[in-house]
Regions:
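Catalytic active-site module of serine/aspartate enzymes centered on a nucleophile-bearing elbow/loop
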Residues: 194-233
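Conserved alpha/beta-hydrolase catalytic His-Asp/Glu region
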Residues: 95, 107-163
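Flexible "cap/lid" loop of the alpha/beta hydrolase fold
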Residues: 73-114
Length: 233
């Protein structure tokens, strides 16, 4: 790649730029990165805000909540998104009767952060768990609650995924309890030009848990994309 590719990274719920720090360091010679956050109570509002600040065209990376927001952005302005990298993503609407994370973050933020730190990464990965907690406390419970409300109010978008004709890399950890591998495979199958990759010994946050491997997969994906004619969008 002769020019660095403008690339927007959207962190997961309660995460900040630290989520992607090591991935960006590995990819620094091929991308021009921007980490963008917009913790609002509706995904559509966050999508509009990020589109107003993003480059004219860009690769788009999102994890978990950030992946749902990335999908909202890509559906709103597919002509601006050159490629997608989604991690820990479930395109379904939230299940009825699920936990109310927003209320929990409002009432008992420390308890909710500790709970999430125990499930977003593999239990044995104490360093990743500690990194998540540090990010969560920096982002803060009010922003996290807004993100959680946006997730709770999201629509099921499976029927629209065929509209996303840009190349896409769907990356899922084999031990992800939140967006398990079957969901990632379904997501890749629903998008016309998507590729699914399974990360071994990895949970919900591949960029934090295995940044070198995650970056290598994205680097290879970008190289393959550059070598292929781009589909009409």
């Amino acid at each position: 790649m002769s020019q660095r590719l403008p690339t927007v990274f959207i962190p997961a719920l309660l995460c900040d730029e630290m989520l992607y720090r090591e991935v960006i360091a590995v990819l620094g010679d091929v991308i021009e990165p921007q980490v963008m956050m917009s913790p609002q109570a509706k995904l559509a509002d966050s999508a509009a805000d990020i589109l107003a600040r993003a480059p004219r065209t860009f690769a788009l990376v999102g994890t978990s909540y950030g992946a749902n927001l990335a999908l909202a952005i890509a559906l709103a302005a597919p002509e601006r998104v050159s490629s997608l990298w989604l991690m820990g993503c479930d395109a379904s609407a939230p299940a009825a009767g699920g936990p109310d994370l927003a209320a929990g973050l409002d009432a008992t933020p420390d308890a909710i952060i500790d709970f999430l730190a125990g499930i977003v990464v593999r239990p044995a990965d104490h360093a990743a768990s500690a990194a998540f907690k540090a990010m969560a406390h920096r982002v803060g419970a009010p922003a996290g609650a807004a993100q959680a409300r946006a997730l709770a109010g999201r629509d099921d978008i499976w029927s629209r995924l065929g509209e996303l004709r840009m190349p896409a890399l769907i990356l899922t950890g084999d031990e992800d309890p939140i967006a398990p591998p079957a969901r990632g495979q379904q997501l890749a199958q629903a998008m016309p030009h998507a590729r699914f990759e399974l990360m071994q010994q990895c949970g919900h946050l591949p960029a934090l848990e295995q940044p070198a491997r995650a970056a290598a997969l994205f680097h290879a994906f970008l190289g393959e994309d550059a070598a292929q004619p781009h589909p009409a969008r």
